[in-house]
Amino acid sequence: MRPISATIKEIIDETPTIKTFRLDVDDWLHGKPGQYVMVWIRGVDEVPMTLSYDNAITVQKVGEATEALFKLKAGDSVGIRGPYGNGWEIVGDDILLISGGVGSAPLAPLGEKARRIGVNVTTLAGYRTKEEVHFEDRYRAAGELVVATDDGTYGKKGYVTDLLKSVDLKKFTQIYCCGPEKMMYRVLCALDEAGVAGLSQFSLQRYIKCGIGVCGSCCMDPDGLRVCRDGPVFDGETLLRSEMGKYARDASGRRQQI
């Protein structure tokens, strides 16, 4: 699939390091929560970004591509391919979302969709500090929300993983998690210890080049699962036997410790 041109209609400053880019395209992207698009920043790179709304991406400035994206203004354009990937599957009628930082991008629309179809939603959201809190209104509109900040400037002091102690993990029909991989791995280990890893879904980030399962750059050990096509959402049991939390591969294919 060749990229289509998408004009940036609006830019929302969510936090000092996170922006939402609303895109104007000829047709709605119609992605399901958890799917992603390949975003081409002309002259820089093409990178995967999760849909945070039907026609929007929410991005944290972390590297060359996102830094270039942050320099664009309303009226500028980017290239878009997709949506790709499997996305979340809503299971049962009482779900838990566990969000770390900009892991909110795929989880907030999941909570909204679940709420619309009558599913009870509880969210545990972790941020570094008060000024990094975002999508709070979306989470609260979906259901119950508990917030933690690393420095205690908002909500409970501590990491989002600390909040797991405050809920009965076994009461939920499905648990969904997205955030930094170290945080997700700690969550996965906690779910495994509680005996509910098989009732969980995680959105994994890897180096993705083609987006259609051909190049193999995003394959995970040991099963060879392609994050771009088989994921980015995987169940907890699958991830327990994978490389998650241990290492990932860079653009050259070399292992990099998480």
UniProtKB/Swiss-Prot annotation:
UniProt remark on cofactor binding: Binds 1 [2Fe-2S] cluster per subunit.
Q: Which domain of life is it from?
A: Archaea
Q: In which pathway does it act?
A: Pyrimidine metabolism; UMP biosynthesis via de novo pathway; orotate from (S)-dihydroorotate (NAD(+) route): step 1/1
Q: Which GO terms describe its molecular function?
A: 2 iron, 2 sulfur cluster binding; electron transfer activity; flavin adenine dinucleotide binding; metal ion binding; oxidoreductase activity
Instruction: Identify which cofactors the protein needs according to its UniProt entry.
Output: [2Fe-2S] cluster; FAD
Name the positions where [2Fe-2S] cluster binds: C210, C215, C218, C228
GO terms in the biological process aspect are: 'de novo' UMP biosynthetic process
Task: Give the record's keywords alphabetically.
Answer: 2Fe-2S, Electron transport, FAD, Flavoprotein, Iron, Iron-sulfur, Metal-binding, Pyrimidine biosynthesis, Transport
Its biological purpose:
Responsible for channeling the electrons from the oxidation of dihydroorotate from the FMN redox center in the PyrD type B subunit to the ultimate electron acceptor NAD(+).
Q: What is this protein called?
A: Probable dihydroorotate dehydrogenase B (NAD(+)), electron transfer subunit
